[in-house]
From Swiss-Prot:
The modification N6-acetyllysine is found at K62. The gene is Rps3. This is Small ribosomal subunit protein uS3. It is a peripheral membrane protein. The modification Phosphoserine is found at S6, S35, S104, S209, S224. GO terms for cellular component: cytoplasm; cytoplasmic side of rough endoplasmic reticulum membrane; cytosol; cytosolic ribosome; cytosolic small ribosomal subunit; dendrite; mitochondrial inner membrane; mitochondrial matrix. It comes from Rattus norvegicus (Rat). The modification Phosphothreonine is found at T42, T70, T220, T221, T242.
Length: 243
């Protein structure tokens, strides 16, 4: 018999499940360009879609790695046998995914690349991918013992109002270097896309669309229009009186 739980408890349980799942996959698939997870619950099973830039690494040789992840998720969250399925989906535009770019910057810094050069490289790649604007902040012991932060901005970025919720993609990551821990924050402002593939369908409130006027077709020959009732017959010529 199914246990009845209140809607409030169900929402909390779903939120905790997704947060724990996201944390686990972030730890396991950090090197494979992990960019997020979607959970779809159907009457028969639960489908978990893993978004990543390198899906082949997530799947593994002959699907071995995805089967291992499925077994771990099934055991950890107490799913019945065969009721959970994991899929790997490639991120459509890597340059518009804040998580993917934060991870990319993290590995650049771990590889010993200078902070300024690494940040400008990420900034350029994001803008070339079609973003409306972006902001990269790196904070920590960048030079010397005193901690400071460096901010790199390009394009347009909104900071307040409801459009921030669906126009700005944000990601925070931490990287442990020899001098200490650096914090990485990446914010990407997505472009307006009526199809909803690379950005939100809803335009910004201050967006103005200018409609091009239609070309007016000028008449080549003069046309007279008769308005009102029936046309009157032409007047008969009057005889000229003779003296």
């Amino acid at each position: 018999m199914a246990v009845q739980i209140s809607k409030k408890r169900k929402f909390v349980a779903d939120g905790i499940f997704k947060a724990e799942l996201n944390e686990f996959l972030t730890r396991e698939l950090a090197e494979d360009g992990y960019s997020g997870v979607e959970v779809r619950v159907t009457p028969t099973r639960t489908e978990i879609i893993i978004l990543a830039t390198r899906t082949q690494n997530v799947l593994g040789e002959k699907g071995r790695r995805i089967r291992e992840l499925t077994a771990v998720v099934q055991k950890r969250f107490g799913f019945p046998e065969g009721s959970v399925e994991l899929y790997a989906e490639k991120v459509a535009t890597r340059g518009l995914c804040a998580i993917a770019q934060a991870e990319s910057l993290r590995y650049k810094l771990l590889g010993g690349l200078a902070v300024r050069r690494a940040c400008y490289g990420v900034l350029r790649f994001i803008m070339e991918s079609g973003a409306k604007g972006c902001e990269v902040v790196v904070s920590g012991k960048l030079r010397g013992q005193r901690a400071k932060s460096m901010k790199f901005v390009d394009g347009l970025m909104i900071h307040s109002g409801d459009p921030v919720n669906y126009y700005v993609d944000t990601a925070v990551r931490h990287v442990l270097l020899r001098q200490g821990v650096l914090g990485i924050k990446v914010k990407i402002m997505l472009p307006w896309d009526p199809s909803g593939k690379i950005g939100p369908k809803k335009p910004l409130p201050d967006h103005v669309s200018i409609v091009e006027p239609k070309d007016e077709i000028l008449p080549t020959t003069p046309i007279s229009e008769q308005k009102g009732g029936k046309p009157e017959p032409p007047a008969m010529p009057q005889p000229v009186p003779t003296a």
